[in-house]
């Protein structure tokens, strides 16, 4: 089915656009392991594979979000599965949905040091600009998915030499906790998934 083929298609496309050899799937690997293997060219560590699995489950098993609604809306017209998945991906790409973790990585890359994170956040808040990865239309408390991803993000950052990214993320969270937690604004699933994805080798786009 197309759902089973999508990870391979994405990995093939990434290898092609970066001028690297295409890697065939290994039937002995799980879906998460195969995706990372075909994408990066090396077998993922158990922690990386677990992180990919956890991310897939946390994002998929979460009720009727915008991209799920988009897919179901298309299917309700008796359209085809390809059109429904295309609609869902189009919705997911938006910066207020799945594209938010890309925005988090852009933000982290703009902050030169851990020490600079506080000023960056406070300046943004003073201008009433959004801090990516915070706030949720349903959760007015800490997103339970972010709790799981924070643990994985820290472990992966330590294992892959990205400790500075995690440290900046944690500092941003601490500053935001002091500034806006009373308003019900907490990290959402996209905040720590950004550093998690970076550490397991997923490209920014």
Mark where each language-model region is.
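Non-transmembrane, aqueous-exposed alpha-helical and coiled segments at domain scale
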Residues: 1-205
